[in-house]
Amino acid sequence: MRGVETRIQEIRHRIFREVARMAYHTEWPVDKRIEALPYKIIPGEVGNYRNDVFLERAIVGERLRLAMGLPCRSAAEHAPLSDNIEAADKPETYYTPPLINIIKFACNGCAEKRILVTEGCQGCLAHPCVEVCPKDAIHLDRYNGRSHIDPEKCIQCGRCADVCAYNAIIIQERPCAAACGVDAIGTDVNGKADINYEKCVSCGM
């Protein structure tokens, strides 16, 4: 989220600070240093961000490699962080394409788009959401009159959200896909975000 200092920004600052230190202190053995850095950036035995300290360190490790211009790796690759580290020390190479990457094991795999009825539904008498649904995907609870959406029928057109007077129906989208102006982010076979590099303009949004 641009303009807002978040915990992601905090981690990013730490990572770039450590990479800059490695570049400045040329006497340090880079291969040993990079292996130790995830433990320095994410100390202790309990995760602070994802409740899994090992996952946090693995993600930080890949972020360190990407910050040094090395390629993004999958979780299936068994190799130390220092693998091919010498490629980062070539003055003619700034980074290994692509510029924008998704660390797959860091992705939450959230839904691309879904429409939800929140607790704000008042079970109103008019129920315009039911009336405008082109697929008859909304039914009313027989006890409290609140709306419920059948995900099997819903085509996610959003008309119900548009007509709700209480703003009780929300449209949830995958944040990265919603931010992409060229529709370059889709979903892979594992439900993780995936970049179509033929569309991607590397804007970083």
Named regions from a protein language model:
Residues 1-163, 167-179, 183-186, 191, ...:
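Ferredoxin-type iron-sulfur electron-transfer modules and their immediate structural context
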Residues 196, 200-204:
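Solenoidal tandem-repeat scaffolds enriched in leucines and small polar residues
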